[in-house]
Structure formats: C-alpha cells, structure tokens
Curated annotation (Swiss-Prot):
InterPro entries: bL21-like (IPR028909), bL21-like_sf (IPR036164), Ribosomal_bL21 (IPR001787), Ribosomal_bL21_CS (IPR018258). The gene is rplU. This is Large ribosomal subunit protein bL21. GO terms for biological process: translation. PANTHER family: 50S RIBOSOMAL PROTEIN L21, LARGE RIBOSOMAL SUBUNIT PROTEIN BL21M.
Length: 102
C-alpha cells in the first residue's frame, strides 16, 4: 500500500516506514505530523483509488539543512559578478501510518 501526498509544493510517493526529506515544517523532533493532502491511495494490489479523506501520519526524525547551492550571476565584459550560496531548511520524516477514512 502506498500513497501520494503533497507538501511544500511537491508530491511524494510514500509507503509505511519510508523516510522522506521535505521542505521545512514547524514541528519539533519526535512530534507526530499529519499530512492530510493525499492525492491518491493504492491498495495491496496497487489499484489506485483517488480519495479525499485519507491521512498519512509521520514522525519528525530531524530538522536539518540541505546541501549548499551556488548562485552565480555574471555579465560579460562589464566586470559584474555576484556569487551567493543558499541552504534550504528541510525536515526528515518517517511515515508511520497510512489511514483511509472510508
């Protein structure tokens, strides 16, 4: 059984006991989080069912930052160069339960 959930503007295909790295959520380590925007749900035979009232429960493993990306801007022959780095805040979740409320 798997579910497709949306959080942080991205979609993730998750099963129970999966570990996923998503955009930052305001939750502390060890706290239970519910992801209620479930787009699709699949049963044991991988038959996809589109449902509106399924809930995915996950626990927060860690709050961390992603790898650094470099943003480099340049205009040729004008001596214009800018270099910036960015590290996005991320939340690591372990999916504990996929619950269909039907």
């Amino acid at each position: 059984m798997f579910a497709i959930v949306e959080t942080g503007g991205k979609q993730y295909k998750v099963k129970e006991q999966d570990v996923i790295k998503i955009e930052k959520l305001n939750a502390s380590v060890g706290e239970e989080v519910t992801l209620d925007k479930v787009i699709a749900l699949a049963d044991v035979n991988n038959n996809i069912v589109f449902t509106h009232n399924a809930i995915v429960t996950a626990s927060v493993l860690e709050q961390c930052r992603n790898d650094k990306i470099i943003v480099f801007k340049k205009k040729r022959r004008k001596n214009y160069r800018r270099k910036n780095g960015h590290r996005q805040y991320m939340t690591v979740l372990r999916v504990t339960k996929i619950n269909n409320m039907e």
